[in-house]
């Protein structure tokens, strides 16, 4: 099973994935956790470039870097893990690119979606389920403000992050069979309980 966790800045994806992984391991599942950009040596190298506020990368170059990292990530880590029977949980995937670069970033939702869905061939490589940790942009940014160092996207203005939130919710509305929206203001364990019910329904 391939699980993706999406959400805006400060939604608590890292804590959610850690807690969800722990519960699934306790149920006897083998879990591989990963993230984007990252998840492989190429992805980790690209991550540094993409998140560095000092790097002045054009929007189209940024998009192509995300896609290059994802193509390698899928082939090198995700597909082998799935073929070996493991459950993969990824912190971000296609829809983060569609929302951040396509919708909030202005490159166009359909244009970016088409590129994402053909990153490893003619057939889209999609997750079995997506958990969207939904949080108001202002609340998420307040959480992030407690950190000492913010990356390029975390430093963007609130209007950008509001567009990100609206973009994710719009995608979730279009694909209710794959998307499950969770309230990121709830305690993490409460969200994990809801997620486990959805995962068990798919098994």
Curated annotation (Swiss-Prot):
Keywords: ATP-binding, Kinase, Nucleotide biosynthesis, Nucleotide-binding, Transferase. GO terms for biological process: dTDP biosynthetic process; dTTP biosynthetic process; dUDP biosynthetic process. Transmembrane segments: none annotated. Coiled coil: none annotated. ATP binds at residues 7-14. It comes from the Bacteria. It is an enzyme of class 2 (transferase). It holds the Pfam family Thymidylate_kin. GO terms for cellular component: cytosol. One of its GO terms (molecular function) is dTMP kinase activity. NCBIfam families: DTMP_kinase (TIGR00041). Phosphorylation of dTMP to form dTDP in both de novo and salvage pathways of dTTP synthesis. This is Thymidylate kinase. It comes from Chlamydia trachomatis serovar L2 (strain ATCC VR-902B / DSM 19102 / 434/Bu). The gene is tmk.
